Design a protein with these regions (language model features):
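Eukaryotic scaffold repeat domains enriched in small/polar residues
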Residues: 24-330
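Bacterial N-terminal signal peptides that target proteins for export
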Residues: 1-13
Length: 330
């Protein structure tokens, strides 16, 4: 809880994972989803417990080979190839207290998964082998209390956001032996948080925080100095309703996933809105309480469309030669 309180379908592309292609041709920029940036949508999954199906997916990540990892409410991590074909899965070690939420790629190519209810961070190989686990429960500096998101810098430093017991952002040194930055405080002012749900690093090392219950994005430099904020509660352009995640590409474009408005807002490096994608619904290109975002090396955007029990892949219009993802692993 917060403290304050006509789209044409193409043929199926894969087997049991249910990948569907949505053609785009009648919206702004010639796009049926109303996007000048993305040309089409691929729908991965659907409700179910079998391979390639999901129960409320809440986190998504992409590795160096553009394979996709999805975490859902069953506590599974499922891996798909870049075309959405199911490859493998593994189960989190414990789910009795609560389910995992929050994923990233670390500097060694491992998949990082956050367990809020266990106050710990896990690093898995792309095949699902647990290689590292860290975090000590508590409110003190260097401890973790209900962590929600993680971002890993190129040098291995880890940014972690927490909420509920303590509203906080910490930057852990690469070896986790010390905390280099702690920003702590519940509230609505700069450097204060109300359920920070998503984190992303840009190419310059600046950190973007989806401050969900404050309905805004805050931006800090790598040392925790406040740079700016944008947003505010609402449904107009430039306003947000419970932004649960944010991603930044090499051009500085920001992609903000709004749980409340069931849409993705795209902004430029100056925080000006470029376009708004989606809206509530179950058709391809529409969302129902999306939770998480990920970008691949071609600039394609993955959306964990939670209440529709699927992941949507928005295919970028630009050829790969014109777009390169940031070297940051997030």
């Amino acid at each position: 809880r917060c403290r304050t309180t006509r789209l044409r379908l193409g043929q199926a592309l894969a087997l049991g994972c249910g990948v569907l292609l949505a053609g785009c041709g009648d919206g702004p920029g010639g796009d049926g989803i109303g996007s000048a940036i993305f040309s089409e949508v691929r729908v991965i999954g659907g409700r179910g417990n079998g391979p390639g199906r999901f129960v409320k997916p809440r986190s998504v990540a992409v590795d160096r080979d553009d394979n996709v990892y999805v975490c859902d409410m069953t506590g599974r991590i499922q891996k798909f190839d870049p075309d959405g074909n199911y490859l493998l899965q593994w189960q989190m070690p414990e789910i009795e207290r609560g389910r995992p939420k929050g994923m990233a790629l670390d500097h060694e190519g491992n998949i990082v998964v956050v367990e809020p209810h266990y106050s710990r961070i896990n690093h898995f190989t792309p095949e699902g082998k647990l290689v590292s686990q860290w975090g000590v429960h508590g409110r003190e500096k260097g401890q973790l209390s209900f962590p929600r998101a993680v971002a890993i810098a190129p040098d291995g430093a880890a940014y972690v956001s927490e909420f509920q017991v303590v509203e906080r952002l910490q930057k852990f040194a690469p070896a986790r032996e010390s905390v280099q930055v702690e920003i702590r405080g519940a509230g609505h002012g700069p450097r204060e948080f109300n359920r920070a749900e998503g984190l992303s690093l840009d190419d310059a090392g600046n950190l973007y925080v989806a401050d969900s219950c404050n309905h805004r994005v805050q931006v800090f430099d790598g040392d925790g100095a406040f740079l700016r904020e944008h947003g505010g509660p609402g449904a107009a352009r430039g306003e947000f309703s419970y932004p649960y995640d944010v991603r930044v590409d090499e051009q500085g474009r920001q992609y903000v996933c709004e749980f409340g408005n069931s849409r993705v807002t795209v902004l430029d490096a100056d925080d000006q809105v470029l376009e708004v994608i989606g809206g509530a619904g179950s058709a391809p290109g529409r969302f129902n309480n999306p939770w998480s975002l990920a970008l691949d090396s071609r600039g394609n955007l993955y959306v964990a469309d939670s209440q529709n029990h699927r992941v949507q892949k928005l295919i970028r219009r630009e050829p790969a030669s014109e777009f390169q993802l940031s070297s940051s692993p997030n």
